[in-house]
């Protein structure tokens, strides 16, 4: 028994109970902040003669406070609690004006602009408490046994509750009811840069395959969609599904669409989609709008340019094959409650979503302010155009109220200080997005894949039972890794990755 105690103590010296939250936040600050800036790249304006702003490196400061007399000095978490302040760091962003258009464009002087405040997670690398000994923590007014992993917003301790989510960019198969009939569905939550699109391929009882995705009213026959993406011949469509078992099914679909809609080329298919997404508009506009919808809303995780259309054709073919396999009994429905199909959105992931939204609002405001300066016959000034409270207030408001991007509520909660155990329990909580008012019997039950990951007993009674869960004591949450490294490694082994 003594050996077991030593082993457990040794484990928790290396892996803290709240490490998953702190590590996720550190990854957000060190990597994902810059990634969000790079996604935007430039701030384009409508200023005559050409004027845009190139965004560079983002710099994260240390927690400081600006006093009434204008002086700036470091602030500790305890002072933030006592004075009802937000424990945050200043953010600075390199911005370079580009004046002119085309070959005449020239870069101006790069300036480092203060863009707002970012709340700091206690215990993270940018916190004053990071790496401090027990004695130093006591001197700073902190409890050395405090797990940290929370924020201080307007003097109140707030914790971001881990959100359980279905895995993005993975095909799931299920049978669904449509107008009293059972259809076989292959669906994927295609996710890119915070945008989430549900794309489906369905086999209807008449044997025809249909697809749905955002931006497209109603269902569209899969054959027409593939042709619009560039599948010029029937052979291209058959090869994308690449399964001899379903050859006759695909031929039936191709023949049916040809007879009913008389669509024989990619141009015909684009025109068909254009009439759906831009009815009553000029032909050129309809075609352009159809291409835009296919680029941005159909499987965006594969890319958002026309060059990515072949990948989308191949992916749709795999989805169609999965739906047909489900219908003919070659595979069963996927178990949505299996933990292989779940992902935990930790503090870093939630902060990434929030910062991306807040930064997009700041970018819109900078564009507006620059254009307004020129209308008043002033020389555009980046420093004058940046209103830092835009970013700061949106982040603070979300963390203070718990209302998150996408309309989620209860993401940020008041830290439970009833007892030490209650605090640790709340910091290791994981919440399902399902409605509390619905039965969801299967989602609430224990699943075999919860073993070692989810505590089987710690869940509340009442409507939250089984939907509010807690990580098991020795559960360790891994972080998302960059797929490109794995792909390069596979290629080095001579494996064809397509």
UniProtKB/Swiss-Prot annotation:
Example of a GO cellular component annotation carried by this entry: cytoplasm
NCBIfam families registered for this protein in UniProt: PRK09606.1
Subcellular location: Cytoplasm
Family: Belongs to the RNA polymerase beta chain family.
PANTHER family: DNA-DIRECTED RNA POLYMERASE I SUBUNIT 2
Cleaved signal peptide residues: none
Gene Ontology terms: biological process: DNA-templated transcription
EC numbers for this chain: 2.7.7.6
Lineage of the organism: Archaea, Methanobacteriati, Methanobacteriota, Methanomada group, Methanococci
Disulfides per UniProt: none
Function: DNA-dependent RNA polymerase (RNAP) catalyzes the transcription of DNA into RNA using the four ribonucleoside triphosphates as substrates. The Rpo2 subunit (Rpo2N and Rpo2C in this organism) is implicated in DNA promoter recognition and in nucleotide binding.
Pfam families reported for this sequence: RNA_pol_Rpb2_1, RNA_pol_Rpb2_2, RNA_pol_Rpb2_3
Catalytic activity: RNA(n) + a ribonucleoside 5'-triphosphate = RNA(n+1) + diphosphate
Oligomer status and interactors: Part of the RNA polymerase complex.
Group of enzyme by EC: transferase
InterPro entries xrefs: DNA-dir_RNA_pol_su2, RNA_pol_bsu_protrusion, RNA_pol_Rpb2_2, RNA_pol_Rpb2_2_sf, RNA_pol_Rpb2_3
Main subcellular localisation: cytoplasm
Annotated source species: Methanocaldococcus jannaschii (strain ATCC 43067 / DSM 2661 / JAL-1 / JCM 10045 / NBRC 100440)
SUPFAM superfamilies per UniProt: beta and beta-prime subunits of DNA dependent RNA-polymerase
Protein name: DNA-directed RNA polymerase subunit Rpo2N
UniProt keyword annotations, A-Z: Cytoplasm, DNA-binding, DNA-directed RNA polymerase, Nucleotidyltransferase, Transcription, Transferase
